[in-house]
Structure formats: C-alpha cells, structure tokens
Amino acid sequence: VIFKGITFNEFKGKKDPDAVYKTMRISFENENGVYEETVFCPKEGDDVRQVSSNNGVERESPSNFEKFKFMLAHIGEQLAPKKYEAFKTKTFALPEEFEKLVKTFADITKDAVNKHTNLKLIANKKGEPCLPYFVNISKAGDAYISNNWLGDKVFFSDYEISQMNKQKSNGPTDMPGTSSDDFATSNDAATDNADLDFEV
C-alpha cells in the first residue's frame, strides 16, 4: 500500500448537532482502493481497562487510551522512526490538545507520504476491512504491541489465514422460492486534563 498521510477532522453529531467530534484519520491506498482508519479523541474513561469473564476466567483488555498510544507508536516507529523519537518526549493535555497532537504527528510523518509499505487488514463481523487487535496485556500487567499491522514485519497467523479462507469460501445464501431475477441489479459503479506520555 501507499501511505497517504494523517489528517485532523471534526464533525457535528447527527443525533446531537451540538456535539462536535474530533478525529485523527490515517489513510492508505493501493490499486484496490482506499483504507482509512478513524480514531476519535480520547474521552473521560478511555484510560480504564475493561475486564471480561469467560468460563470463570477474568481477562483484562487494554484501554482505548493504551490502544491510541500504541497506534501512534507503531505508525511512528515504522514510518518516521527518527522524528518519532523526538515526538514521544512531548506531552499533550487531552482532550484539549488533541488537534495539536494530531497535527504535530501528521507533520512528523509527512515525509513518509506516498511511501510504499505493508498494511495488515482483517475482516470484522460485517466482512469489512479493519485493523487486527494489536495491543495485549502481559502477565506482569503491561500493555504491549502483540500484532504488527504496518511495515516490513507483517504476517498473518494460522488463525487469521483460516478466517480469510472462510470469508473467501462464503457464498450467497440460498433462499427457497426466490431467484436472482427477483432482485433488481445496478451497475453503478485520553481523559480530562490527562497528559499523554509517549514512553511505550
């Protein structure tokens, strides 16, 4: 893929026109199309790790804030390693300085725009492309990148390959009493006042 850059965006909510959402958009493209990952400004509570229970075993998941930090780290280390070293020493108060953070990060990665790289995408439950889960919690309780999705060291696990093959083999569902003629076709083509520390 080709890295097309990072942009800051804001838009008003549909349900609540008074609500303004601030996002960071990361763009890639190749001959098959465009992929954009949209990350929302961290909000209060995003630094809390969720705990789920399965068969009596509790499992802690990385917080949204940790995922955001490690996303920036992964992009920075893969696309602008020298400039990222300086960037991660900076501190930004969130959510107030989210726009400043995004524009600063866009600036340190601008030399990588139009650079060819590898991007790992998987399918979500709807079959749409998305980034894989890439942050995990160690036994010691530390968050870490467990799944590279950008750069030269991008690989698919056996499980991910099996899921891709499953997606490819999924055909249309047969519906009794219907035929393809029954359907018309178309050919139209972080938390309040929290400081973001980038030591990861």
Where is each model-derived feature located?
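Short beta-rich binding modules
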Residues: 1-200
